[in-house]
């Protein structure tokens, strides 16, 4: 059973903008999110100040998320260029 998806208003705006500017990247992102909802463990576990979060790479961009096991949900936290997302 797939996990529920949780996003923020900020990510929703990013996704809407991406769907208009780069349809191919948006399609790839959408497929990757579906994969994550089916198997949240596919992302790379992060360390340091981002411990507990996971990332998947989509071209030069990274999608950061966390798994909320108690709620059977995946919360998307950030999506940005690789150089900017790791702060």
Regions found by a protein language model. Give the residues of each.
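Charged, low-complexity, helix/coiled-coil-prone segments
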Residues: 1-8, 46, 50
């Amino acid at each position: 059973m797939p996990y529920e998806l949780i996003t923020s208003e900020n990510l929703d705006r990013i996704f809407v903008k991406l769907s208009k500017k780069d349809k191919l990247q948006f399609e790839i992102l959408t497929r990757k999110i579906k994969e994550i909802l089916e198997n949240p463990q596919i992302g790379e576990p992060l360390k340091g100040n981002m411990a507990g979060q996971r990332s998947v790479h989509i071209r030069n961009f990274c999608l950061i998320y966390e798994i909320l096991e108690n709620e059977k949900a995946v919360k998307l936290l950030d999506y940005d260029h690789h150089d900017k997302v790791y702060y």
